[in-house]
Amino acid sequence: MFKVIHRYVGPASLSLLTFKVYASSKKDSPHKDTVKVNELSLYSVPEHQSKYVEEPRTQLEESISHLRHYCEPYTSWCQEKYSQNKPKIQSLVQWGLDSYEYLQNAPPGFFPRLGVIGFAGVVGLVLARGSKIKKLVYPPGFMGFAASLYYPQQAIVFVQVSGEKLYDWGLRGYIVVEDLWKENFQKSGNVKNSPGNK
């Protein structure tokens, strides 16, 4: 083991200078008893064993615990609804971003057409004064008519799909009415044809 005899402190630029270091050899040093690392007091292991004791809860901790247990069903319900609605919300946001991008790079003549279609809706609303059914039918009808003038191919596809859906709904309604008719009015028909009424 080397022992440094001369120390020098100076600026960092002077650290590149060379100088001599005098050290004593192992033969000159007196023999010392070596100490193992685990014998040092720094590394000594305490002999007593510690035991974990949980501190008693305070009133604030108890009230927070009760509040968490009370709110847990509601938070789990909210998380479930959020996970169910997250894809729908993301698709709605994506649709909004796509619409915004389309409106930023709109084809020529799009905004005048949109203005005419909107004006047709306002005219339908003005002509529908008085009746609630007219207010529900006239504005979309006028807007649909104006849109079909500018976009005839899309209007044809829309009418075909809407016609099929309306036919299906009408057929379902007819079946429901027929079932109700058979249940309610055939029973009363049997009373008229009973032998006591002849």
UniProtKB/Swiss-Prot annotation:
Give the signal peptide range: 1-25
Its PTM note reads: O-glycosylation; glycosaminoglycan of chondroitin-sulfate type.
The record's keywords, sorted A to Z, are: Endoplasmic reticulum, Glycoprotein, Golgi apparatus, HDL, LDL, Lipid transport, Membrane, Mitochondrion, Mitochondrion inner membrane, Proteoglycan, Secreted, Signal, Transmembrane, Transmembrane helix, Transport, VLDL
Q: Does the keyword Secreted apply?
A: yes
Question: Its membrane topology, per UniProt?
Answer: Single-pass membrane protein
Spell out the subcellular localization from the entry: Mitochondrion inner membrane; Secreted; Mitochondrion; Endoplasmic reticulum membrane
- Which residues are listed as membrane-spanning? 108-128
Q: Name one Pfam family in it.
A: ApoO
Q: Name one GO biological process term.
A: lipid transport
Instruction: List the GO cellular component terms.
Output: endoplasmic reticulum membrane; extracellular region; Golgi membrane; high-density lipoprotein particle; low-density lipoprotein particle; MICOS complex; mitochondrial inner membrane; very-low-density lipoprotein particle
Where are glycans found on this sequence? Answer: 162
The answer on whether this UniProt entry bears the keyword Transmembrane reads yes
* Assigned protein family: Belongs to the apolipoprotein O/MICOS complex subunit Mic27 family.
How it assembles, according to the record, is: Component of the mitochondrial contact site and cristae organizing system (MICOS) complex, composed of at least MICOS10/MIC10, CHCHD3/MIC19, CHCHD6/MIC25, APOOL/MIC27, IMMT/MIC60, APOO/MIC23/MIC26 and MICOS13/MIC13. This complex was also known under the names MINOS or MitOS complex. The MICOS complex associates with mitochondrial outer membrane proteins SAMM50, MTX1 and MTX2 (together described as components of the mitochondrial outer membrane sorting assembly machinery (SAM) complex) and DNAJC11, mitochondrial inner membrane protein TMEM11 and with HSPA9.
Q: What role is this protein assigned?
A: Component of the MICOS complex, a large protein complex of the mitochondrial inner membrane that plays crucial roles in the maintenance of crista junctions, inner membrane architecture, and formation of contact sites to the outer membrane. Plays a crucial role in crista junction formation and mitochondrial function. Can induce cardiac lipotoxicity by enhancing mitochondrial respiration and fatty acid metabolism in cardiac myoblasts. Promotes cholesterol efflux from macrophage cells. Detected in HDL, LDL and VLDL.
Q: What is this protein called?
A: MICOS complex subunit MIC26
